[in-house]
Regions:
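Transmembrane alpha-helix boundary signature
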Residues: 6, 14, 44-48, 66-89, ...
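Interfacial loop-to-helix junctions that mark the boundaries of transmembrane helices
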Residues: 15-28, 49-58, 79-91, 193-202, ...
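Hydrophobic mid-bilayer segments of alpha-helices in multi-pass membrane transport proteins
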Residues: 28-39, 53-70, 90-99, 244-254, ...
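Membrane-interfacial helix-loop connectors
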Residues: 68-70, 131, 141-156, 160-162, ...
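Alpha-helical transmembrane segments
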Residues: 84-96, 195-213, 282-301, 364-370, ...
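Juxtamembrane and boundary regions of transmembrane helices in multi-pass small-molecule transporters
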Residues: 156, 175-176, 194-240, 416-469
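Core mid-bundle transmembrane helix pairs that form the ion/substrate translocation pathway
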Residues: 196-310, 466
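Transmembrane helical segments that form the transport core of multi-pass membrane transport proteins
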Residues: 254-389
């Protein structure tokens, strides 16, 4: 049987990662755990110190992984691993966030904006539906400021942004490969583009339950705000709501197109060499900045530049636009991406030996790991594992035939459970940072985890009982 170029490249990379992961010691995961502990605890006990010394903490924990790794495997191998992480994962991650942050910051709403339970439910529903078509990050950046602005008159607002993260930043992105990077990787491995629409019943089930819970929570908070004499500041009743900076939707479309291209170009023969590897600029060892990734970065940066050049500063002023949120995310996540490498390598090397062969097992394994690790490689590990189980009926992919129920479970686990923590998906921490900047007192890392355990985990248990058993 002939093996395609993409299959050859995937097999080569998988074997290389397996070799590394099998030699990896769990002790190398300590810096990742330490960094997560800092993110969770220090804002509570040493907030001012943490605010001033975040970069130093990132450097400390990153070096605590890199230096021992270099001692054991050699400086060249350590440098290659860090460079590979930065080029393959972090670069496109932060450029995408940056581009969407810039473009969305140049769009604002004006008029009679008063957040109420019904209006908030409607806005969360709109954002959730947008997530699958412009990405969870795109929808989050587009909707976060309008929702904050509409509820600015209220005292009790943190629950609104928590459910925003649940629905818009995560669960809503399950219907297309544009929605969330794991599904884009599935598309690159042979899953049809519109296959994810099969997940609509699961999405509808989750959205109905969570929006119902949210409505009653928000109604209670709303009544308390009104009872305390708070009311929306509407100076001109009847003023029509309108959008300023609407032309920036063109630049948003450019960014979405860049993401789609990054997922489709690597599979084209023009972007592959004779061995099936994606062409690009060789940097060091086996690290290459691929041409599809470079094209994505250039398009996004051009979109961000044009957005700023064509939009009035007054719109950004009305949005209270600052660079603080993107700076915080950029600093924290470079450390997270570097220190999580040992955990990902171990997972990739041992995923097939976990003994998972049922949809509900795949759902929880993929989801729990996606809550703390990058959900894209986690998705690929379990998709590869499922494809190697030898099933003959189901969805044919280049990794093997995967039963439809198992593919649905892996997809939902990766997309939905990124909502469990602030670091589970790209937009989560960004939404938190923007909310904090706008005076909303967001839960701490553990506080947010309590919200997800209280409201999300019961819903995911219902998902398992209804869809994956």
């Amino acid at each position: 049987m002939d093996v395609s170029r993409e299959e050859q490249f995937l097999l080569f990379v998988t074997k290389k990662e397996d070799r590394e992961g099998m030699m990896m010691n769990l002790a190398f995961c300590i810096p990742f755990a330490g960094l997560l502990l800092c993110i969770a605890v220090l804002p509570l006990v040493k907030a001012e110190w943490w605010e001033a010394h975040q970069p130093h903490a990132i450097v400390f924990w990153s070096l605590l992984f890199v230096l021992p790794f270099a001692f054991v495997y050699g400086p060249g191998q350590a440098f290659e691993k860090v460079l590979e992480c930065i080029v393959d994962d972090y670069l496109t991650f932060i450029i995408l966030l940056f581009g969407l942050f810039c473009v969305s910051g140049n769009i604002t709403l004006e008029g009679d904006l008063a957040g109420s339970p019904r209006i908030n439910v409607g806005l969360l529903l709109i954002g959730t539906m947008l997530s699958s078509w412009i990405g969870t990050t795109g929808a989050s950046m587009l909707m976060v400021r309008p929702i904050i602005k509409m509820n600015a008159w209220r005292k009790r607002r943190s629950h609104i942004m928590v459910f925003f993260i649940f629905l818009i930043s995560n669960i809503g992105g399950c219907l297309t490969p544009i929605g969330d990077p794991p599904l884009l990787m599935g598309f690159m491995r042979g899953v049809p583009f519109f296959w994810s629409l099969h997940l609509f019943p699961v999405l509808l089930f989750n959205v109905v339950i969570l929006l119902t819970i949210f409505y009653f929570l928000d109604r209670r908070a709303y009544r308390k705000d009104i009872a305390e004499g708070l009311k929306p500041d509407i100076s001109k009743p009847g003023t029509e709501v309108h959008i300023l900076g609407l032309h920036n939707l063109i630049f948003l479309a450019m960014i979405v197109a860049a993401v789609i291209l990054s997922g489709t170009l690597p599979g084209m023969a023009a972007f592959q060499d004779a061995e099936g590897a994606v062409r690009g600029i060789h940097l060091f060892g086996e690290v290459t900045l691929t041409y599809p990734a470079l094209i994505e970065v250039v398009i996004i940066l051009v979109a961000a530049f044009l957005s700023f050049k064509t939009t009035s500063v007054e719109i950004r002023r009305k949005n209270h636009f600052t660079w603080g949120a993107i700076q915080e995310v950029a600093v924290l996540f470079v450390g997270i991406f570097i220190t999580m490498q040992p955990a990902l390598m171990i997972l990739k090397a041992n995923g097939a030996s976990l003994g998972l062969n049922k949809p509900f097992e795949m759902f929880w394994a993929t989801g729990c790991l996606s809550s703390f690790l990058d959900n894209t490689p986690t998705y690929l590990v379990f998709l590869t594992t499922a494809g190697a189980l030898g099933f003959t009926e189901g969805m044919p992919t280049i990794l093997g035939t995967v039963p439809v129920a198992m593919l649905e479970a892996i997809s939902c686990g990766a997309v939905f459970m990124g909502a469990n923590t602030y670091i589970g998906n790209a937009p989560n921490f960004m939404v938190k940072s923007i909310s904090d900047e706008n005076g909303i007192r967001m839960p701490s890392f553990f506080g947010y985890l309590l919200w997800s355990v209280t409201f999300l985990i019961p819903v995911f248990l219902l998902d398992m009982l209804v869809f994956f058993l």
